[in-house]
Amino acid sequence: MKVLILQGSPRANGSTAWMAEQCKKAAEAAGHDVTLVNVARKKIAGCLACEYCHGKGNGACIQKDDMQELYPLMAEADALVLAVPIYYFTLAAQLQAPIQRMYCVNKPAKVHKMALLMSSYSPGVYAGAMAEYHDICNYWGVEDCGIVTAKNDEQKTDETRQKIADLVAKF
């Protein structure tokens, strides 16, 4: 199975990056073909709502930025993992842009499983991101394989590593 992990934290050595790396290791150990992309390091603009993609573009976005690298990866992925820090109640902007740019293709062609990894230093801030994630799963018609959250002292622990491995086992 091809697994695509979109990591949305600008902090290269932060908790979200660690969670994404643990997911990659667990998925590779399970025999999956894994691609990990730090979308926070990419130049991906938000959707312009210009509708070029649904007219002359025939499914292609008019914007020629780093999202062009992600479209083929999304098209080939069987499973998609979103790894994101929660700064203020919802998915971080760095991950919002690539998700919303999928508008031009409507839904990823092969993705049938999804998972969400979230980190935060504040308790009680995950509900908005969880609701958005569940909406994406429902709209795309994909199986929700689970959510792993890690706050404060839960970050970068063996317990969190095991929760991520258990989530990957659902792929």
Placement of each model-derived feature along the sequence:
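Short beta-strand elements in bilobed, periplasmic/extracellular small-molecule ligand-binding domains
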Residues: 33-38, 142-150
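Short, glycine-/small-residue-rich phosphate/pyrophosphate-handling segment
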Residues: 106-147
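Cofactor-binding loop segments of dinucleotide-utilizing enzymes, especially the Rossmann-like FAD-
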Residues: 8, 39, 118-121, 149-150
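Short glycine-rich anion-binding loops that position phosphate/pyrophosphate groups of nucleotides
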Residues: 86-88, 121-122
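A general marker of short, structured functional hotspots
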Residues: 83-84, 129
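N-terminal beta1-alpha1-beta2 submodule of the flavodoxin-like/Rossmannoid cofactor-binding fold
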Residues: 1-83, 89-104, 154-171
